[in-house]
Curated annotation (Swiss-Prot):
SUPFAM superfamilies linked to this entry: Helical scaffold and wing domains of SecA, P-loop containing nucleoside triphosphate hydrolases, Pre-protein crosslinking domain of SecA
InterPro entries named among the record's database cross-references: Helicase_ATP-bd, Helicase_C-like, P-loop_NTPase, SEC_C_motif, SecA, SecA_CS, SecA_DEAD, SecA_motor_DEAD
Catalysis performed (reactions): ATP + H2O + cellular proteinSide 1 = ADP + phosphate + cellular proteinSide 2
Record-linked Gene3D superfamilies: 3.10.450.50, Helical scaffold and wing domains of SecA, P-loop containing nucleotide triphosphate hydrolases, SecA, preprotein cross-linking domain
Lineage, top ranks: Bacteria, Pseudomonadati, Pseudomonadota, Alphaproteobacteria, Sphingomonadales
Record's cofactor remark: May bind 1 zinc ion per subunit.
Taxonomic source organism: Erythrobacter litoralis (strain HTCC2594)
Binding site for Zn(2+): C901, C903, C912, H913
PANTHER family in the cross-refs: CHLOROPLAST PROTEIN-TRANSPORTING ATPASE, SECA INNER MEMBRANE COMPONENT OF SEC PROTEIN SECRETION SYSTEM
Protein name as catalogued: Protein translocase subunit SecA
CDD domains in the cross-refs: DEXDc_SecA, SF2_C_secA
Gene this protein is translated from: secA
Length: 917
């Protein structure tokens, strides 16, 4: 009450902040006549003028008023659109690195041009991030007209474009693309062995469209580039067959957390089934020998019970495709980890792709926090304002609408069960459609959208269904959802980014209806006809009450509900919104208070009868807040754990960059060799120990294993006052001499490439293994809570130790390969290297898709760079040490890398003749 009174007297802090920006808007408006008087050439010349001013010491804030006035006038001349004052406010907010919350239809795309142009003048690059490829292409083409007119370059990043085009797009002043494309390019760049092949340049300024969707909804799922491991198809299928025989009483499922566990009776029963299937190594299910089977059993149970087809995923083209729970869109290229995706594939009987090992990973939180300045736009951010600040240090500023919102948001209607609810929904839709009022229906899953479609078919109501199955036509369906009597069913908020205009969208109608008509008088006449029809239809829709938004159930997040409501009432248009709920809705069933069901049952509701109640609405809001808090905790935990990895990732990526930028890395290699020798001696002869305590035999073995040397330790031990430091110095001299002889017998230019190539390769290899270890640690560290320990603190401590071990192993590995291997110059490679290195073709991501053709160790690329490598710890050298890719008699044959080598050595193929493949 007191806060409400204070706001009414003094206004909210948001109101005061927006009002303060009004002074800048006044400066921009004061320049309008002056800028309007400029010729086209003079207006275009403003960009160079601003660049000169920046070079003379002015700041972006200094030139902001005139730059914004320039963009507004250029927009009028090029696009036929003038920025409103509230849009200028939004532009200032974006430039300051904040989030502009603007209602649907307020022109966020146009707002972005202000901050984008201003920051692009510096020439350091501006990234405009969208939620899908369609919007990236559309906005780059649409707003690109304005930027290029003003002398700026524009690029767009979409899947499957060549590397050179991708690099050119990043070098443009302004680059459009999706969050996935930007993130995966960052990871791929940091796996390359040559700086020239990288596509991104240093981060500068990013503007994230639909910022809540990208930075909040998708923040629970990290971006992962991975390579396939060994094929376990038979095991997945066998375990799935066992799980399909499981009795529901054998397990306990928690729908809130999507966790599932076996009961005591279930453990015993499933153990019998596994024995019958011949899947157990020992009699006891939980013996260590059965760890892998138990893991796949748990994943198969989760896949069969907790993951629902057409809700969590769909099957398309014989593949399991994940459905984004917030947008209803397909997440092409994304796969569940730890064997879960393979378990779902086995459940559905589709081709089982190999399980993958993480090679590079980053969360969206840590990716976007690398931008020195980041801003965002959305229609709904206020409910997550605290999270935006806690994670990204970004304020949310609510921008006033240009025209007051006329939409009426009605009370929710409650029904006893789903059938009653859907019958009422179908009836309401039929009534509204009959009077010409367009209806947009929001559902939470494909299954529900298709169930409602069946109800509407029975009512004889013509309608369009928009879900992950039909996403290709998404923009066109949404664009026409405001036509007279149109009924559109959309799963969650599919279609964000496309305005629903009452009466229909002129541009889309022209595109759909006149695509085959050539330019000329006939086409011009047809365009005028369509414009007139849309205008007349708009008037009829306005008379019918505008767009009616109908929600079939409440989402877990209030923000998603607000997004659905926000599709109606754009730019002062009339509109109506209403939600239909029942006790069988997931939100109420899983998270609703226990008393809700009793009160509903005692309300004497007849079948098909609805009830409206403030108490029920309050219960819904409480349940949503509970889920939002839980989801925030999950996202916060994700970033806490990734922060640990992120610190290590920065070190590794910075080290890679230094190596790539260095002409030679001989100093690094020498330091690694000396550090390795120090570690060998220190391990065998600990400081403060006596000679009789030294492990001389162990030191002999390790020096020969790592360095290929056989120093006379027995003679040295007979010397008086022998010290570990003397061992270290003498071993170092022997190792340095061996390396000097090797280098002297090798082409200097080749040796530089060898050192750099091996250093990068082994760094990548051990980083990949380190990521796998951290993943495994993450899976089990939560168990430390039972010992009254903080899992995150335990994770930090162990991760640090593992990272130190990574660096130690890297030093030893590089030293061993260089000192023990023999090299020869390979014949020159005539063909041009591919844009993407060979080892990237096995990655699971939107650019490259799935490919199980190699194990991702980069050997093919190394062979091209510096010839074959023999005698390393990873390869069995043939006599004379000249083993290599050209000496493999089995090259080209389809041999699994984990199969025994055909030569009969007893080693796996990948450790023998297949080592350089």
């Amino acid at each position: 009450m007191f806060q409400t009174l204070m706001k009414s007297v003094f206004g909210s802090s948001n109101d005061r902040y927006v009002k303060s920006i009004g002074k800048i808007v006044d400066q921009i408006n004061a320049l309008e006549d002056q800028i309007k008087a400029l010729s086209d050439e003079a207006l275009k010349a403003q960009t160079q003028k601003f660049r000169d001013q920046l070079a003379d010491g002015k700041t972006l804030d200094d030139i902001l008023p005139e730059a914004f006035a320039t963009v507004r006038e250029a927009s009028i001349r090029v696009l036929g659109m003038r920025h409103f004052d509230v849009q200028l406010v939004g532009g200032v907010v974006l430039h300051r690195g904040e989030i502009a919350e603007m209602k649907t239809g307020e022109g966020k795309t146009l707002v972005a041009t202000l901050a984008t142009y201003l920051n692009a003048i510096e020439g350091k690059g501006v990234h405009v991030v969208t939620v899908n490829d369609y919007l990236a292409r559309r906005d780059a083409e649409w707003m690109g007209q304005l930027y290029t007119w003003l002398g700026l370059s524009v690029g767009v990043i979409v899947p499957n474009i060549p590397e050179h085009a991708r690099r050119d797009a990043y070098n443009a002043d302004i680059t459009y693309g999706t969050n996935n494309e930007f993130g995966f390019d960052y990871l791929r760049d940091n796996m390359k062995h040559d700086r020239a092949s990288m596509v991104q340049r240093p981060f500068n300024f990013g503007i994230v469209d639909e910022v809540d969707s990208i930075l909040i909804d998708e923040a629970r799922t990290p971006l992962i580039i991975s390579g396939p491991t060994e094929d376990k198809t038979d095991l997945y299928i066998a375990v799935d067959e066992v799980v399909k025989r499981v009795d529901p009483e054998w397990y306990e499922a928690d729908e809130k957390t999507k966790n599932i566990s076996w009961t005591e009776d279930g453990n015993e029963a499933v153990e019998v089934l596994l024995k019958e299937a011949g899947l157990l190594e020992t009699d006891n299910l939980y013996d260590v020998e059965n760890t892998q089977v138990v893991h796949h059993l748990d994943q198969a149970l989760k896949a069969n019970i907790m993951f629902k087809k057409d809700t969590d995923y769909i099957v398309k083209d014989d593949k399991v495709v994940i459905i984004d729970e917030f947008t209803g869109r397909m997440m092409d290229g994304r796969r569940w980890s730890n064997g879960l995706h393979q378990a779902v594939e086995a459940k559905e009987g589709v081709k089982i792709e190999p399980e993958n090992q993480t090679m590079a990973s980053i969360t969206f939180q840590n990716y976007f926090r690398m931008y020195p300045k980041l801003s965002g736009m959305t229609g709904t951010a206020a409910t997550e304002a605290s999270e935006f600040w806690d994670i990204y240090k970004m304020n949310v500023v609510e921008i006033p609408t240009n025209v007051p919102v006329q939409r009426i948001d009605e009370e929710d209607e409650f029904y006893k069960n789903t059938l009653d609810k859907f019958a009422a929904i179908a009836k309401a839709i039929a009534e509204k459609s009959a009077i010409g009022q367009p209806v947009l229906v929001g559902t939470v899953s494909i299954e529900k959208s298709e169930l409602l479609s069946q109800f509407l078919d029975k009512e004889g109501v013509k309608h369009a269904v928009l879900n992950a199955r039909f996403h290709e036509s998404e923009a066109h369906i949404v664009a026409q959802a405001g036509r007279l009597g149109a009924v559109t069913i959309a799963t969650n908020m599919a279609g964000r980014g496309t305005d629903i205009q009452l009466g229909g969208n002129v541009e889309f109608r022209i595109e759909d209806e006149l695509k085959d008509m050539e330019d000329g008088p006939e086409r011009e006449a047809a365009i005028e006809r369509i414009k007139a029809e849309v205008k007349a239809e708009r008037e009829k829709v306005l008379e019918a009450g505008g767009l009616f938004v109908l929600g079939t159930e409440r989402h877990e997040s209030r923000r998603i509900d607000n997004q659905l409501r926000g599709r109606s009432g754009r730019q002062g248009d009339p509109g109506l919104s209403r939600f239909y709920l029942c006790l069988e809705d997931d939100l109420l069933r899983i998270f609703g208070p226990d008393t809700l069901f009793a009160k509903m049952m005692n309300s004497n509701l007849e079948d098909g009868e609805a009830i409206g109640s403030k108490w029920l609405s309050k219960a819904i809001e409480t349940a949503q807040k509970k889920v939002e808090a839980r989801n925030y905790d999950i996202r916060k935990q994700v970033v806490e754990y990734d922060d640990v990895m992120n610190d290590q990732r920065k070190v590794i990526y910075e080290q890679r960059a230094e190596i790539m930028d260095s002409e030679a890395v001989d100093d690094v290699v020498v330091d690694m060799r000396h550090d390795t020798i120090n570690a060998l001696v220190t391990t065998a002869c600990p400081p403060g120990s006596y000679p009789e305590q030294w492990d001389i035999e162990g030191l002999k073995e390790r020096v020969e294993e790592v360095l290929g040397l056989a120093p006379p330790f027995d003679q040295w031990m007979e010397e008086e006052q022998i010290e570990p430091e003397i061992f270290e110095e003498r071993i170092r001299e022997l190792a340095d001499k061996a390396m000097e002889e090797k280098i002297a017998a090798t082409d200097p230019a080749m040796w530089k490439r060898v050192e750099k190539g091996i250093l990068l390769d082994r760094l990548d290899h051990h980083w990949k293994e380190h990521l796998a270890t951290l993943d495994a640690l993450r899976q089990v560290v939560f168990l430390r809570a039972y010992a009254q320990k903080q899992p995150i603190n335990e994770y930090k401590q162990e991760a640090f130790g593992l990272f130190e071990r990574l660096l130690e192993t890297l030093r030893e590995d590089v030293t061993s390969i260089l000192i023990k291997s023999e090299f020869r110059i390979a014949p020159p490679v005539e063909q041009e290297l591919p844009d993407l290195p060979d080892f990237l073709t096995g990655h699971i991501d939107p650019l490259t898709g799935l490919d199980d053709s190699n194990d991702g160790d980069g050997s093919a690329q190394r062979a091209e760079l510096f010839g074959s490598l023999a005698g390393s710890p990873r390869a069995a050298a043939s006599p004379g040490g000249a083993s290599g890719v050209t000496d493999n008699p089995y090259a080209g044959q389809d041999i699994s890398r984990n199969a025994p080598c055909p030569c009969g050595s007893g080693s796996k193929y990948k450790h023998c003749h297949g080592a350089a493949i």
